[in-house]
A protein has these predicted regions:
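Extreme N-terminal leader/targeting segments of oxidoreductases
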Residues: 1-4, 23, 417, 467-470
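N-terminal glycine-rich phosphate/pyrophosphate-binding loop and immediately adjacent elements
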Residues: 2-142
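A conserved FAD-binding loop/helix module that cradles the flavin
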Residues: 54, 440-466
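Active-site/ligand-binding neighborhood in enzyme catalytic cores
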Residues: 133-244, 409-416
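A glycine-rich dinucleotide-binding beta-alpha-beta segment and adjacent secondary-structure elements
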Residues: 188-200, 384-444
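A conserved beta-strand/loop element that lines the FAD pocket in flavoprotein oxidoreductases
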Residues: 241-254
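Mid-domain catalytic core of redox enzymes
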Residues: 255-353
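C-terminal segments that line or cap access tunnels to active or ligand-binding sites in enzymes
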Residues: 314-403
Length: 472
């Protein structure tokens, strides 16, 4: 039985802790804050409740596998998880388009797109997602289910999306997602694809075309909501950790990773005490630790996250019942800006049936850096929004940093193949024996499913060693 110290109580860190505890190790999680879940938070006021982090789960198989591998009770007995259908509504006011797409139905999506965007739109969309499926099939194992191997940055640096090649610029280099969407979809339909990718904090103008795997995953595996809010999923993972005898130390800020005899040997805490360990898992952005506290030079700190944007979020308390025709998720597209509006049909989010809780969020940038800008766009999705508004709360990147410690409130996106490897995350192993990286700032990147997968990868590397070949 090894002693494992885990830094942070985010979703990836807790997934790692639960898997290691099942393998027989003694695991302690050290969290600087007062609670678990990392970015998966919840805000409550006057009977209203809001998710302050991710509001939906894509690729739920990651958490189903976690619960199967760590206990007798499957995920569905621990949380009430429902597939969202319709999956998403797209509002493009500058084009006069308002279209609602069904969940996990390629045929249904194609039919809806044909109606909204004209003849051939559904066929073009399915062709793009078909090529995205090829990219998914080519990279699913090395990009999501296996540790990042030496040389992976070279092998995954090429874009696996089989874009339609044309003369000119695209002969000299692979297209960006925006270029691919413009060529293969065109016009307003291209904005739908780039908008879905942009929700992840990825810039379509610089991202590789392989980013189309993200809309492919959503459409193929569906979008899922946990009743009671996504915080209920974090609570379920936390409770599974407790069942497996994982210990949690809250208010325990880490000052330094201790290295003795050339390997990680524990943690130095802010109160001056030391926590000895046989292995250390860093489940946070390493930039959160004080400069010089890591056993490598500052310029070599992994997951620097340069240019990773944060989120601006509005929590809206509305008078009046949620309309029966309301769609759970709406993306409002505007020139140079987009917002996501979440309207869950969940009694746990509102004081009674005569009120509604709505969350509006956007990646910070031009057109989405001020609350008023978000509210203006959200009006396109929620009829009579301003007249119904009782009160609202604003969550800025600075608020996220204060709550979670994430530098600049940055929210890491999933790792992607292509772009010369610049959209990959650092490997789960490090140059220091016994020190591992988990969570959204490590391979395979951010987002609930990807961060959750770090649990399987890090646990496998610790339990099976360097010969571990990935999750099965």
């Amino acid at each position: 039985m090894a002693r494992i110290a885990v830094i942070g109580a985010g979703m990836g860190a807790m997934a790692t802790a639960a898997r290691l505890a099942v393998a027989g190790h003694r695991v302690t999680v050290y969290e600087r804050g007062t609670t678990y879940g990392g970015a998966v938070g919840r805000y409550e006021r006057e009977g209203f409740a809001f998710d302050t982090g991710p509001g939906l789960l894509h690729l739920p198989a990651v958490y189903r596998d976690l619960f199967v591998k760590t206990g007798k009770r499957p995920l569905e007995t621990c949380v009430d998880m429902v597939q969202v259908n319709p999956a998403v509504r797209h509002v493009l006011p500058h084009h006069g388009i308002d279209v609602t797409l069904p969940g996990a139905s390629h045929g249904g999506v194609a039919t809806a797109l044909e109606s909204a965007f004209g003849a051939g739109a559904g066929e073009r969309w399915n062709a793009v997602l078909g090529r995205a499926r090829d990219a998914w099939d080519a990279t699913r194992r090395p990009l999501l289910e296996e540790p990042l191997r030496p040389g992976a940055r070279q092998s995954l640096g090429g874009d696996p999306y089989p874009a339609l090649r044309r003369s000119g610029l695209l002969r000299r280099r692979p297209p960006t997602l925006a270029e691919m969407a413009d060529r293969e979809l065109g016009g307003a339909l291209a904005e739908v694809l780039t908008g879905l990718v942009g929700e992840y904090g990825i810039d379509p103008a610089t991202a590789p075309a392989s980013a189309a795997v993200l809309p492919y995953m959503e459409q193929t595996f569906g979008s899922w909501y946990v009743r009671g809010g996504m915080r209920a999923l974090a609570t379920a993972v936390y409770e599974r950790c407790l069942e497996r005898k994982v210990a949690f130390a809250f208010g325990a800020e880490v000052r330094e990773v201790l290295v003795r005899d050339g390997r990680a040997a524990g943690l130095l805490l802010a109160d001056g005490s030391e926590a000895a360990a046989d292995a250390v898992v860093c489940g946070i952005d390493p930039r959160q630790l004080p400069a010089g506290s890591l056993p490598w030079p500052p310029e070599a700190v992994p997951a620097r996250g340069d240019g990773v944007p944060g989120r601006l979020t509005l929590l809206l308390a509305l008078r009046g019942a949620r309309p029966a025709t309301a769609v759970h998720r709406t993306v409002v597209h505007a020139p140079g800006a987009r917002v996501t509006v979440l309207r869950p049909d969940d009694p746990a989010t509102r004081p009674d049936e005569e009120h509604e809780a709505v969350t509006v969020s956007a990646v910070t940038g031009p057109g989405t850096s001020e609350p008023a800008e978000l509210l203006n766009l959200a009006e396109k999705a929620v009829q009579g929004l301003r007249e119904r508004l009782l009160w609202h709360e604003v969550r800025t990147p600075a608020d996220i940093e204060a709550a979670t410690g994430a530098v600049g409130g940055a929210v890491p996106p999933p790792a992607l193949a292509g772009a010369g490897g610049r959209m990959l995350r650092p490997a789960n192993t490090t140059a220091v024996p016994g020190l591992y990286l988990a969570g959204g700032w490590a391979h395979p990147g951010g987002g609930l499913p990807h961060a959750g997968m770090t649990g399987a990868l890090v646990a496998g590397l610790i339990v099976e060693g360097a010969e571990f070949r990935g999750s099965r």
